Regions:
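Feature captures the catalytic cores and cofactor-binding loops of soluble hydro-lyases/lyases
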Residues: 1-111, 125-157, 162-164
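C-terminal binding/interaction regions
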Residues: 115
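Beta-strand-loop-alpha-helix segment that lines the small-molecule cofactor/substrate pocket
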Residues: 118
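Channel- or pocket-lining gating/hinge segments that regulate access to a cavity or pore
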Residues: 121-123
């Protein structure tokens, strides 16, 4: 095991390096943390991640676990992880670097890449595809809205014969 200088490898220090190194508006930024094989270990919790609120991040994404779901649910940012941990993870993992490529669930993620997350999960969108993906997403949203309007107006028997 390597000995790391504790004052250099702190969550707070590397959190701010990651956020300050992002060219995007913090409100459009997701902090991505790789567990590097420790996916059952807590990488952070409500106290450490309160920094995300302080700087206005949109969310946090990790393949590891997070703690304090009740606290995180009250925060204005979204959090995606592999599950909730009870125990503090600092005895197992320590932050090491910021603004480097990481691998989450077999997917390479590079600083500045587009990530879309919702309650179903997260998707990394290649830079070369962003315009097409956004255009398609807007069309899907419009189609869904039109379908909801149609469903809201349908009669009782109509709903039995229509696909949606």
């Amino acid at each position: 095991h390597a000995i790391l200088a504790p004052e250099e490898y702190t969550f707070g220090r590397l959190f701010h390096q990651a956020v300050d190194g992002s060219p995007a508006n913090p409100g459009n930024t997701v902090l991505v943390m790789a567990s590097n094989g420790h996916s059952s270990t807590s990488l952070a919790g409500g106290t450490k991640l309160s920094r995300a609120t302080n700087v206005g991040l949109a969310g946090v994404l990790t393949d590891g676990r997070l703690r304090d779901f009740d606290e995180l649910a009250a925060e204005p940012f979204a959090a995606w992880c592999s599950g909730e941990a009870v125990a503090w993870g600092g005895a197992v993992v320590t932050p090491f670097q910021a603004n480097i490529p990481v691998v989450i669930e077999g997917v390479g993620i590079y600083p500045g890449q587009y990530i879309f997350c919702d309650s179903s999960g997260a998707v990394v969108i290649p830079d070369s595809d962003i315009d097409e993906v956004l255009e398609t997403a807007h069309q899907v949203r419009a189609d869904d809205s039109a379908s909801r309007d149609l469903i809201a107006r349908e009669g009782r028997n109509e709903g039995l014969t229509r696909e949606r």
